[in-house]
C-alpha cells in the first residue's frame, strides 16, 4: 500500500493581466480546456475538476498551450520564448523537445491539421514569429512582414495551407506555404489586432482588435468579405477592445469576448449579433479570452473566473471561482464539509469539499494579502491581512456574510492568527503587538521583538508567539492580558507554531528546517530528542492531526512531510513535490488520514495519508 495518494485537486485559475488577451487551448475531443498560470500548464475537464492535469516542467512563466489535432502532443510557450513539446498520453508528460523560438514572450501557438508543423508568435528582438517542424525544430518558413509584436496566429485547417497572424501594427498578415512565406497584409483595424481564427473548414477567417471591430475574410487569399456590426453601436461589434474570438464547431457562428464586459454570439451568414451576454459591471468582469469546443463555450474574466456560456439561451450557466495568486491560508468548517482559502490579493473562496464547487466571498473582506484565516464552531470567519485589520465575518446563508464583517484596526501589521474553536478569543501576532480580540473588544499588548506566527491552546490557557528573534515566546492568557512564562530558543527565525488539539504538545518550526515538538506539561521541554530536519528548505507551516498523533508540515522545498509522535525515530512520510515548483504555504487536516495543502502555485490538493 502506498504511503500517500492525491485524492483531489482544486486547480488554479488562469493568470490574467488587465488589457491582455488570454489564449485558451483545448483537446481534440473538446472535453478539456488548457490555460496557464505561473510556470504550469493546466488541462482541465469542462465537466468537472477531478481529472485536471498539471504540467510543471517550464522554468519560466508560461503564456500559452495548445494540443495537437492528433491529441498526442502539446506545445506550450513561456515568457523567454521557449516552446516545449511534450507527450499528453502519459501522466509523466515526457518532453519531446524544446525549441527556443525567439527572445521574448510567446503569445500564441498553432498546430497544422496534420500535427506536423507549429507556428508560434510573440514579442522577440529579432523576429516576432516562427514556423517549424514539431519533431526536429527545423524551420518551415519565415513569418515576417509585420512591424511590431504578433499577438495571434492560426493555421488554415485544410489545404492549401495558410498561416494568418495579427499584430500590434494594426494589421492582419497571411502567409503561403509550406515552406511559408509572406503574401500580404490587411489594414482593416485601426488599433492592435488581438485575435485571428480560421473557421473549421478553412473557408473563412476572422480578426478582432482594440478598435472593437470583427472583420471576416476569405480563407485562401484574405479578401475582406464582411464586418460584424451591432446595430445598437456605431459601426463596431463591441464598445471596447475585443480580446478574443472563437468559431462554433459547425462554423455558422462566432463568439467574441470584449473589454465592454460582454460576450456576443454572431451569425456568420448575416454578420449580425444573435445574443449579447453581459457578464457584470466591474472592471474585473472584462472578458479577456474565449474558446468554443465541441462540448462547451468558455470565457475568461479579467479576475480569472472561468465562465461556461450557454449560446442558445444567451446566459452563463456556471462560473468556476478560485485563485490565480498565491494561496496564503486555509481553514475548514467545523463539520468538515466546507474549505475556506485566502490569497495574496485579499480574496477568500469557499469550497464544497465533496464536489469542488467554489464561491468567491463577496464583497472582498480585504484588499491586500491575507495572512491568517480561521473558522469557528459557530460558522464565523476570522481574518487578518496586511491592510492592518482583524475582521470577523459572521455566518450567513449557506456560508458567511462579508457585507456584515466587523473590522478592527490593528496598530501594526499582522503576521499570524489563532482563534479558539468557539470564537470567544482571537489572537493576532502583529509586527510590534499581540492583539487579543474577545467578545467584541480588541486589546493590544506591545512586544519588544518582531513576531512571525501565533498559536492558541484549545483550553485558552496558553498563547505561543513565534518571533523573528529566533525564539518562541509562551504566554499565560488571562482574559485580555498575557504574561510570559517561557522563552524557547531556536537556531533560526520561527516560521510556524501549533498546539495539539488536546493541549499536550506545542510544535515550532523555523527557517533552519527544524520541526521541534515540546511537552506542555513538562514546562515546554523537548517532547523527544530526535532530529526532525528532513525538509531541505525553510518550513513554512504546520498542523496537527485531530487525534494528536501526527503532524504535517509544508515547506519552501515544495514538499509536505507527515511526522508521527508515537514513532519519532521512524522515517516520516514525505510527499515530495507536493506542489511542484512552488512553496507550500498552508496545510490543515480534515480528518485523521486526510491533509489539505495549498501553495504559491494557487492550487489546493487533498492527500490521503494512511497510518
Curated annotation (Swiss-Prot):
Cellular compartments annotated: Cytoplasm, Cytoskeleton
InterPro entries found in the cross-reference section: G-protein_beta_WD-40_rep, WD40/YVTN_repeat-like_dom_sf, WD40_repeat_CS, WD40_repeat_dom_sf, WD40_rpt
Record bears the keyword Cytoplasm: yes
Primary location recorded for the protein, binned into one broad class: cytoplasm
Listed GO MF terms: actin binding; actin filament binding
Any one GO biological process: positive regulation of actin filament depolymerization
Domain of life per record: Eukaryota
Start and stop residues of the WD repeats: 57-96, 145-185, 188-227, 237-276, 322-361, 446-485, 489-528, 534-573, 579-610
One of the record's GO cellular component terms: cortical actin cytoskeleton
UniProt xrefs under Gene3D superfamilies: YVTN repeat-like/Quinoprotein amine dehydrogenase
General function of this protein: Induces disassembly of actin filaments in conjunction with ADF/cofilin family proteins. Regulator of actin organization in myofibrils.
Family affiliation: Belongs to the WD repeat AIP1 family.
Protein name from the UniProt record: Actin-interacting protein 1
Organism whose genome encodes this protein: Caenorhabditis elegans
Lineage, broadest ranks: Eukaryota, Metazoa, Ecdysozoa, Nematoda, Chromadorea
Amino acid at each position: 500500500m502506498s504511503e500517500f495518494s492525491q485524492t483531489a485537486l482544486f486547480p488554479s485559475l488562469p493568470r490574467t493581466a488587465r488589457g491582455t488577451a488570454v489564449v485558451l487551448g483545448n483537446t481534440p475531443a473538446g472535453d478539456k480546456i488548457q490555460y496557464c498560470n505561473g510556470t504550469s500548464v493546466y488541462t482541465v475537464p469542462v465537466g468537472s475538476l477531478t481529472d485536471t492535469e498539471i504540467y510543471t516542467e517550464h522554468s519560466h512563466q508560461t503564456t500559452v498551450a495548445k494540443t495537437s489535432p492528433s491529441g498526442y502532443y502539446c506545445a506550450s510557450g513561456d515568457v523567454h520564448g521557449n516552446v516545449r513539446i511534450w507527450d499528453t498520453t502519459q501522466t509523466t508528460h515526457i518532453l519531446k523537445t524544446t525549441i527556443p523560438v525567439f527572445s521574448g514572450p510567446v503569445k500564441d501557438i498553432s498546430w497544422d491539421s496534420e500535427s506536423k508543423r507549429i507556428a508560434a508568435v510573440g514579442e522577440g528582438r529579432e523576429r516576432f514569429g516562427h514556423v517549424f517542424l514539431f519533431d526536429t525544430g527545423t524551420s518551415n518558413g519565415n513569418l515576417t512582414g509585420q512591424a511590431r509584436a504578433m499577438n495571434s496566429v492560426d493555421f488554415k485547417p485544410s489545404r492549401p495551407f495558410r498561416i494568418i497572424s495579427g499584430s500590434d501594427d494594426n494589421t492582419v498578415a497571411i502567409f503561403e506555404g509550406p515552406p511559408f512565406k509572406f503574401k500580404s497584409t490587411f489594414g482593416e483595424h485601426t488599433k492592435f489586432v488581438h485575435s485571428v481564427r480560421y473557421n473549421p473548414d478553412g473557408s473563412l477567417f476572422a480578426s478582432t482588435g482594440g478598435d472593437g471591430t470583427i472583420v471576416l475574410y476569405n480563407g485562401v487569399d484574405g479578401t475582406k468579405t464582411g464586418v460584424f456590426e451591432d446595430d445598437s453601436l456605431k459601426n463596431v461589434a463591441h464598445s471596447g477592445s475585443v480580446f478574443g474570438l472563437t468559431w462554433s464547431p459547425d462554423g455558422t457562428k462566432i463568439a467574441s469576448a470584449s473589454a465592454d464586459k460582454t460576450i456576443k454570439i454572431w451569425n456568420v451568414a448575416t454578420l449580425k449579433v444573435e445574443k449579447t451576454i453581459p457578464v457584470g459591471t466591474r472592471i474585473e468582469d472584462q472578458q479577456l479570452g474565449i474558446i468554443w469546443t465541441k462540448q462547451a463555450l468558455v470565457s475568461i474574466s479579467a479576475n480569472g473566473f472561468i465562465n461556461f456560456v450557454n449560446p442558445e439561451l444567451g446566459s452563463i450557466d456556471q462560473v468556476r471561482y478560485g485563485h490565480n495568486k498565491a494561496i496564503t491560508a486555509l481553514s475548514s468548517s467545523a463539520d468538515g464539509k466546507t474549505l475556506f482559502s485566502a490569497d495574496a490579493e485579499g480574496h477568500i473562496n469557499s469550497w464544497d469539499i465533496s464536489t469542488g464547487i467554489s464561491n468567491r466571498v463577496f464583497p472582498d473582506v480585504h484588499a491586500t494579502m491575507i495572512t491568517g484565516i480561521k473558522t469557528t464552531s459557530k460558522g464565523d470567519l476570522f481574518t487578518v491581512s496586511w491592510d492592518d485589520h482583524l475582521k470577523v465575518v459572521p455566518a450567513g446563508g449557506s456560508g458567511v456574510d462579508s457585507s456584515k464583517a466587523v473590522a478592527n484596526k490593528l496598530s501594526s501589521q499582522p503576521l499570524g492568527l489563532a482563534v479558539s474553536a468557539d470564537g470567544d478569543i482571537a489572537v493576532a501576532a502583529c509586527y510590534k503587538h499581540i492583539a487579543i480580540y474577545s467578545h467584541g473588544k480588541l486589546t493590544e499588548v506591545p512586544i519588544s521583538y518582531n513576531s512571525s506566527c501565533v498559536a492558541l491552546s484549545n483550553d485558552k490557557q496558553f498563547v505561543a508567539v513565534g518571533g523573528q528573534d529566533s525564539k518562541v515566546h509562551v504566554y499565560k492568557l488571562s482574559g485580555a492580558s498575557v504574561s510570559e512564562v517561557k522563552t524557547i530558543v531556536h537556531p533560526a527565525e520561527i516560521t510556524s507554531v501549533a498546539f495539539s488539539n488536546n493541549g499536550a504538545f506545542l510544535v515550532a518550526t523555523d527557517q533552519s528546517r527544524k520541526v521541534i515538538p515540546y511537552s506542555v506539561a513538562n514546562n515546554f521541554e523537548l517532547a523527544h530528542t530526535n532530529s526532525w530536519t528532513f525538509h531541505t528548505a525553510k518550513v513554512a507551516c504546520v498542523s496537527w492531526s485531530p487525534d494528536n498523533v501526527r503532524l504535517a508540515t509544508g515547506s519552501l522545498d515544495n514538499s509536505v512531510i507527515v511526522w508521527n509522535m508515537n514513532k519519532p525515530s521512524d522515517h516520516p512520510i514525505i510527499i515530495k513535490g507536493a506542489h511542484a515548483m512552488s512553496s507550500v504555504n498552508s496545510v490543515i487536516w480534515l480528518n485523521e488520514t486526510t491533509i489539505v495543502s495549498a501553495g504559491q502555485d494557487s492550487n489546493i490538493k487533498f492527500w490521503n495519508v494512511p497510518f
